[in-house]
Amino acid sequence: MAGAAQTTAFGQAVIGPPGSGKTTYCLGMSEFLRALGRRVAVVNLDPANEGLPYECAVDVGELVGLSDVMDELQLGPNGGLLYCMEYLEANLDWLRAKLDPLRGHYFLFDCPGQVELCTHHGALRSIFSQMTQWDLRLTAVHLVDSHYCTDPAKFISVLCTSLATMLHVELPHVNLLSKMDLIEHYGKLAFNLDYYTEVLDLSYLLDHLASDPFFRHYRQLNEKLVQLIEDYSLVSFIPLNIQDKESIQRVLQAVDKANGYCFGVQEQRSLEAMMSAAVGADFHFSSTLGLQEKYLAPSDQPVEQEAMQL
């Protein structure tokens, strides 16, 4: 952002596959932040997003419309969206002019849900990179639907997608398991919740997959994928129920720590509070245990016994 005298701005780039709850997250997080006294500006970067439930400070639809692109260039939804993001990348002066008057706000960027934008296409990464040069410190908040935990094969896929996104986007990163209140609506978890949030020994997942005749044929492939995930050892998740204020607060603490907002000058903080943010909350077993008791049905037998029966 222009001007040497301007202060650093902070925000979140909310990404994730379609249906993961990005727009709902932006609504809930913006309301929570305003309740804390922060000035919030929600920026819609998804040209396919219509009927937004939140007050939108900047809307990319004012620059380029997905339906217009599809009609004029004879593109499908995915191709049209990629073109829109490339068009935004080529017209970043428009975005900068929209964001400059909002200096002093905390930004929430509601991003498109096409996975390829966050795994290998360069437009969104280039946009984020340019924002950092405007002295806008972002944390990528990557949402995935928590019900994928109920299917070992899908969970491995989610881990691969999350890892690819972390490596491609090149921002401080927080992964969220969204819709925690619905986690067992599609099936029972094979392991305790902390197994999925901390991404513990994935060999247990391979054993679980081996019990399925279909996936037994792909054991070597799954072993290589698991080895790749564990070699990087980057992926972990924070559980989120956007209707639960305590859950939102845990997410916000992680985001503020990732982008440095907790050390900013906008709010007066004591040294004790700063040190607490710097060294605390990494070992959140107790909070994860509380979430398990809150959202998961109790198991009739310990996890170790369940694993031995696989």
Swiss-Prot record:
Gene Ontology molecular function terms on file: GTP binding; GTPase activity
Motif (Gly-Pro-Asn (GPN)-loop): 76-78
InterPro entries reported for this sequence: Gpn, Gpn2, P-loop_NTPase
Residues the record marks as site: Stabilizes the phosphate intermediate: N78
Residue numbers of N-acetylalanine PTMs: A2
One Pfam family named in its UniProt record: ATP_bind_1
Gene3D superfamilies the UniProt entry points to: P-loop containing nucleotide triphosphate hydrolases (3.40.50.300)
Record's keyword terms, sorted: Acetylation, GTP-binding, Hydrolase, Nucleotide-binding
Domain of life, per lineage: Eukaryota
UniProt: GTP binding residues: G19, S20, G21, K22, T23, T24, S178, K179, M180, D181
Family: Belongs to the GPN-loop GTPase family.
Assembly description: Heterodimers with GPN1 or GPN3. Binds to RNA polymerase II (RNAPII).
PANTHER family documented for this protein: GPN-LOOP GTPASE 2, XPA-BINDING PROTEIN 1-RELATED
Summary of the function given for this chain in its UniProt record: Small GTPase required for proper localization of RNA polymerase II and III (RNAPII and RNAPIII). May act at an RNAP assembly step prior to nuclear import.
Protein's recorded name: GPN-loop GTPase 2
Organism: Sus scrofa
Organism lineage string: Eukaryota, Metazoa, Chordata, Craniata, Vertebrata
